[in-house]
Amino acid sequence: MHELAYGITSNNAAFGAVHNGVKPAYMAGGSSGGTATAVAMNMASAGIGSDTGGSVRLPAALNGLVGFRPTTGRYPNSGMTMISNTRDTAGPITRTVAEAALLDEVLSGDNSSLAAIDLEGLRIGVPRAYFYETLDVNVASTVESVLKKLSAKGAILVEADLDDIGELNEKVGFPIVLYETSQLLPAYLAKYQPETSTEELVAQIASPDVKGIVADAMAGAIPEEVYRDARDVQRPLMQAVYADYFRDEGVEAIIFPTTALTARPRKDDMATVDFNGEQVPTFPSYIRNTDPGSNAGIPGISIPAGVSSEGLPIGVELDGPAGSDRRLLAIAAAIEKALTETD
């Protein structure tokens, strides 16, 4: 995985880069890239990763798998070393939605059976602004094909946008995770390894990108008042935007590309990647679509949607209202079936 779960390539300077399970010369995604690759290469039937801003769904998408992030708080966090108690959750990475639903049942204790969903008349939101902007050409064509198939099955695609979602996401995401990391890592050391100081921990981080982020967090990059505004004001506003959207548009889920671009070739320095002919920052480019739902704490699931012209997996994500986990899994299962049916 990416060191300390702080990245999306799984290029780990301490243990080496994780290879993509479908195209080994390409990045696995992250931060739970090792889990995804193990499942993709049949080393495991399923796995459990951690998801702060996309770390389960993103590597699942890039490896042709299913990745499920539950409503925050649905699963116990015992055994996890948290970097954000507000945002972190465990999540299954599997080959099928049914397997993800089984692990959800085990992890949550919710053994309610999945409803049989008829796509005919099912209302699904399509938020074009933000989520569909600036896509890799293969991703764009694949997702449009998915929407066409769903429409042909009778699903009602509601073209409506989430108000100010990008702006709210910026105000919530990094302020919360960086501040909480600055509190949680020292507390972890004090409890489990009191002989190691925070400064010593930071000095031992092998990955330069992670060391820079964690060092900034520990140095107080996020003032407490900014954190409290993000957690207590901006995040509730963001949650209200989602709740209002689901209610006012009468949709049970929203659908969008899990990532705006496919996996890129592995290289030593992955601070930037090629995206539509330009070098762009890797981290924000990949988490753009997975991050908002994470910050709002709502459930999201990435399922395989197809492959690029190079054979690289492409995922499509479904997000649902807070607490609708089993319903969202049932909807995902119905869409998975529709996408795998031969014409």
Predicted stretch roles:
Residues 106-287, 295, 337-343:
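Amidase signature
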Residues 1-90, 127-129, 256-278:
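Short glycine/serine-rich loop/turn segments
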Residues 1, 162, 305:
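Active-site loop/turn elements of alpha/beta-hydrolase fold enzymes
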Residues 33, 95-98, 288:
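A generic structural signal for residues located within well-ordered alpha-helices
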Residues 18-32, 73-80, 182-196, 283-287, ...:
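Short, basic, helix/turn surface patches
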Residues 13, 289-290:
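C-terminal core of ALDH-fold dehydrogenases
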Residues 41-47, 52-133, 140, 144-153, ...:
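Structural helix-boundary/capping segments
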